[in-house]
Structure formats: structure tokens, C-alpha cells
Regions:
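Conserved S-adenosyl-L-methionine
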Residues: 181-208
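C-terminal edge-of-domain segments
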Residues: 142-153
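A residue-level signal for conserved active-site and pocket-lining positions in enzyme catalytic cores
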Residues: 96, 144, 184
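Short, flexible active-site-adjacent loop segments at beta-strand->alpha-helix junctions, enriched
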Residues: 100-102, 150, 157-159
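An acidic- and aromatic-residue-enriched active-site/binding cleft used to recognize and process polar
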Residues: 14, 158, 206
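Non-catalytic nucleic-acid substrate-recognition regions in nucleic-acid-modifying enzymes
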Residues: 2-140
């Protein structure tokens, strides 16, 4: 694999411009806006930096492969060709997320099943050991997006959605996700206000 990787960062719709600026400041290059996402290239160090410091992204996806598909079998074969031993031990756990439709795949559950089957079949080639499925806390989370006959296969570097920072084990329900709250502050010019010595009090800030 090369030293630079294609990355997709997902976000709530309408925050693409803010995320584009934030990700550029964190080192993402050749960044472009998409619907509810941005796309760019970066070294792995930058990918980890985005996972750690982005306040606006939901997920950071590292693109492993793009390939055309005509039907479910070509989807399976395309995923099977990836060297999954580089990413997961045969006795590890995985979760698969699938979005999009077309090329004979009109059900996301069926598409995810074909992706899962290909990964499992690849990993059990060595000695028959196969990974388990864990949708809550997998060792590897894979995402495949189907767009007009092209499959975009990615590793989810962020695990859980990045708005779930998890530093508080007990929390009450909040009206805003943390990344959306951060976007509201940016739109309101809070960084400038704070730099000028301004103060902010929010007695209903949820997890902060």
C-alpha cells in the first residue's frame, strides 16, 4: 500500500464546508465536498489525527479498493481479492455496513451479507478459523458503498461514531450530538469570541 490514502469523512448534512476547512487544517489534502461527507488524501498519521481531533466528523473511512460490479457475484469476488490478513486475525471479529443499491443488489442487508461472506471465506482459507460477527464492538468495521455500479470498499478507522467521545460512562439524553453542537459554535463565531475573552454559559449542554 502507498504512503498516502484516500479518505472519506462523513458528517451531518450541511456541515460539509465546515468539515472541509477543519480537515484541511488537520492535514487532509486535495479535499472536496460530497453530500454529508468530504473526500481527500493523507498519510496514515493524518488519518489518526483526524480521528483524534476532528470535532465535526462522524466517521473516518480509509478506502481500500474501488472496483466495478455487475452483480452480487462480482461484488463477492472484488471483496475476496483484498488481503484481509493485513487487517484482521482469522479469529477476530468484524462488522459490515453497506449503503447504496443497483447492479442487482437492491437490499442493503443482502449486500452486507455478500461482503461478510467474502471476508470470512478469505480468512478461513489458512486453517479453517473464521472471524465472528460483532456489530457493537468489532475488531474491524468495514463499509461498502455502492454508487452507480462502482463499489467503494473502506475500513472504518473511527470505530464508533466520533460524536461518541465516551469519556463519561453515565450521561443524560442531550438534544444535540456533540459534533453538531461544535458546528453551531463555529457558525456563531465562538472561536473568535473566546479569543477576545468572551464567556459562554450553557446549563443544558448534555455531555459537554
Amino acid at each position: 500500500m502507498s504512503d498516502r490514502y484516500e479518505l472519506f469523512l462523513t458528517c451531518p448534512k450541511g456541515l460539509e464546508g465546515l468539515l472541509l476547512e477543519e480537515a484541511g487544517n488537520l492535514g487532509l489534502e486535495e479535499a472536496r465536498e460530497h453530500t454529508s461527507a468530504i473526500r481527500g488524501v493523507a498519510e496514515m498519521e493524518t488519518a489518526y489525527r483526524l480521528c483524534l481531533w476532528s470535532r465535526l466528523a462522524n466517521r473516518v473511512l480509509l478506502v481500500l479498493k474501488r472496483f466495478p460490479i455487475q452483480d452480487a457475484e462480482s461484488l463477492y469476488e472484488g471483496v475476496l481479492e483484498v488481503d484481509w490478513f493485513e487487517h484482521l486475525e482469522p479469529n477476530g471479529s468484524l462488522a459490515v455496513e453497506f449503503s447504496g443499491n443497483g447492479s442487482g443488489i437492491d437490499n442493503t442487508h443482502f449486500g452486507a451479507l455478500k461482503v461478510k461472506d467474502a471476508i470470512v471465506d478469505k480468512l478461513r482459507q489458512k486453517d479453517g478459523t473464521r472471524p465472528s460477527i460483532d456489530k457493537l464492538n468489532p475488531d474491524m468495521r468495514v463499509h461498502l458503498r455502492l454508487d452507480r455500479g462502482e463499489a467503494i470498499l473502506s475500513l472504518d478507522l473511527s470505530g464508533h461514531s466520533l460524536h461518541q467521545r465516551g469519556y463519561r460512562l453515565q450521561q443524560g439524553a442531550a438534544p444535540l450530538k456533540e459534533n453538531l453542537a461544535a458546528a453551531v459554535l463555529l457558525r456563531a463565531g465562538w472561536p473568535r469570541i473566546a479569543a477576545e475573552g468572551g464567556a459562554l454559559a450553557d446549563p443544558m449542554c448534555g455531555v459537554g
